[in-house]
Amino acid sequence: MSVEECVERVARGEAPRDVFTARGHPNVTARNQKSLEITKDPYLTKRGDCIVACCSEKAAGELAGDVLGALARGGVVVLILDTGNRWDYVIGETPMATPTSKWRIVVRKSGYIDDSTVAIHADKAASDLDRGLVAELRRGVPLRVTIGVCPTV
């Protein structure tokens, strides 16, 4: 299956996925070139240059059970970020581990894995996201987050 087909399957709910909301913040800079993060924290500083949203309803360890199970196996991870006006998506590999973090979700370009990692070897970090989307997030708008996994066969 192609990456485009995987994105479409996740968007249509035909693959294990979880959908929840977070919120942008005036201090979103999205300048980090190695990772991106969504946090449950209600506030962020400009030093958190990987953080693209706060006030998340979920952290990595709180994702739907079928998503957590799929993250522990081989597959393609799709992260879709949608404000209603602007959207972007990130593709990565499953970490082959079940995340347990109760505070954050992290997508990494590297192969590093910790308790918050939901994707490794991703094609984008915070700095690679659509800048129109980042501008909207800086205004503090609500963000619809979709995390899905297309298992490898």
Regions from the PLM with identified roles:
Residues 3, 7-152:
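Conserved mixed alpha/beta catalytic, RNA-binding, or beta-rich assembly cores of soluble enzyme
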